[in-house]
Amino acid sequence: MKKITVTLFLLLFANSVYSQKKPLDHSVYDSWKSVGSISMSDDGTFITYTVREQEGDGYVEVLNSKTLEKKSVQRAEQPVLTPDGKYLIASIKPFFAETKEAQRKKLKPDQMPKDTLGIYNCLTGELVKHPFLESFKKGLYGNKYIAYQTKMPADTTKGKEPVKKDKKAGSDLMVFHLESGTTDTLKAVSEYSFSLGGDSLFVVRRPGLQDSLLDAGLFMYTPKNKELRTIYTSDSGQTVKLPVISQDNRHLAFLVKPDSTKTGNDSASIFYYTEGFPSAEVLIENEHIKDGWQISDNREPVFSKSGHRIFFGIAPVRPVKDTTLLEADIARLDIWHYRDNYVQPQQLVNLKRELEKSYLCVADLGKEQEIRQLAQEEYPQVHVPCEHDADWGYSVSDYNYQLESMWSADPRADLYIINVTDGTSELVLKDHYISNVGASPEGKYLVWYNNLDSLWYSYNRANKKIVCITPDMPVSFANELHDTPEMARSYGYSAWAEGDKAVYLNDRYDVWQIDPSGQTPPVALTEGLGRREEITFRIARPDYVVYPPGVRRLEKETIKAGATVYFSAFDEKTKENGVYYTKTARRKSGKNDAMKACIKEPMTFNDLNRSTESGVICYIKHNFENSPDVWITKDKFKTQQKITDINPQQKLYNWGTAELIRWKSTFGRELEGILYKPENFDPARKYPMLVYFYERNSHTLYTYKSPAPSRSTINIPFFVSNEYLVFVPDIIYREGHPGQSALDCIVPGVEKLI
């Protein structure tokens, strides 16, 4: 009798808890947060991540992975953690409500609330602020210095005449030493950037009227000894761009162009500076370029990895703009012809890109100037492997097939190999359906996938032979779930082995180690475990450095012999996700280690980050019932520690569950879908049901969905919380019958549920 009483009490208590939970309404959206932008110090001690509200004030949190102590910097965005983990630099936004009120009052941009620079000491917890922030930068690997500029808000005092300023003039640049807290000021700076190591700061100076005694041009500032070195002194009206730096930090190159606002021409010259030069010298001018062409300022120069070559762009000279005519007197006319490669609306969309298009050229440093044009009209995009150090380049061109791209989903292309040493080219493939074209890191091979025969091929640069590298394979490399009226694409490739000895190709489930020369038999890096267990493995690079935009790092790091390789894992049967790992073969053994599972759970894992000097792994984990939160592991997932709880308010609401449903279509195919049910679901009740469908979605069974308005999908948490069922069925399309296919897949699934 006591057992019955206790059971009855627990049931009544559970029901009362469910009944106390509120349904979601539209007022709750702003309280829901998201987490992302994970960064980690090299030794794994400090981890930072950003927490954002849909509308509101977010923050950056700093975690000490050893003590699990957390500190937050309120309203911080764009966080940058120094590699040694000592400092976090971020832009601190104004209060959201303050910005919203300023927008409501329709204030001018210079009257809007300004950002603040925040410099947070991760060791002491001290936060230093510098108001009215306009921008800040740091060397990618730098630990000591940052630079920033501020902009004072407009003076809105009544009756006071605004001070007229030269809009092109530079402003003060502050160079801040993180350890000492001291600041150096550089005047009239319009642009600036650090070297990767952060030891040198390059500034473009453009003095205004108040700084008329200062020289304009490009300068290099060394914060350690406070030395400002002149690289180039510019004339009035010239525009000087920030330099590109060779990987050995010995060479600089930059563009200088005259004032082109009146003529519409973007002619430029390339200047060069290296150790021992008193100042920069002209390297390439338009007189070195063929008639009718000029150096383009729309393509930044780039040094080859060795620093022996420089690559840049040229473009046809455009007609000089007649500045004597008024805009109203200039006739504007768009002419279209039925044999144009693109229809007129697309031509207009592409106009800016076409006007800025340039063609790749190369010149050797230290030799008499010989400009070699690599790109041509027939193949306008040329890629040079080995970080521009290879003696060859390649181009995949649809030049001869652009017209048919308007109606064909399977575009054809030609493949060219270009000799970098003399600019000549060779057509190695004509009229082929190719994709996933890419060169090996050391430039020995070029690989591609043939969409027509579903095979991978390689081009050997040494002997110029093309071989099929996946003949007679027991698996297909074409998308096995492909169901649209076009050729099936491949699953791509993940990485290269050190020395270009292997390329890692993906099939539906496994990763294959393939010899690009075609001589060594293929080896399944994942041992065929994926196909046996129906688990999709993909190489993950949690310790791979993600370089910010603008940093030239063209090749991913190769996988070395004996290296530990991590894989993301997705179980097609259960929809669970996880992480596996193996070790590649050492040179002597010649055999890879067995696959080992770190973890597999009914969850989704995102943003895996591994410290470069320790075994700390930080990641985001979630499923439909559990909001995305930050977790860490120090022992390859044997134990996990949850770090955040960003949406505790979810417990107050009637949430939901996600369940995998299986059925057969009317044409006999096995299908899957997701049924979302309210948390307080009662199987004895009847519920209204919504059906949302779009291709396949069953793989998202363990994916969180924030309550939020959407223009394209339905708000599943909202409807489930308000006691609707939501059914999301997969659809398998049959060619030529999309509507009937959807009907044949969806209706049987709905009938099974009702």
Where are these regions (language model features)?
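Serine-hydrolase catalytic core recognition
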Residues: 600, 604-754
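Intrinsically disordered, low-complexity peptide-like regions
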Residues: 13-14, 23, 458, 607, ...
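Beta-propeller folds
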Residues: 19-611, 615-616, 622-628, 632, ...
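Bacterial Sec-dependent N-terminal signal peptides
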Residues: 1-22
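Generic low-complexity, intrinsically disordered sequence content enriched
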Residues: 12-16, 529, 723
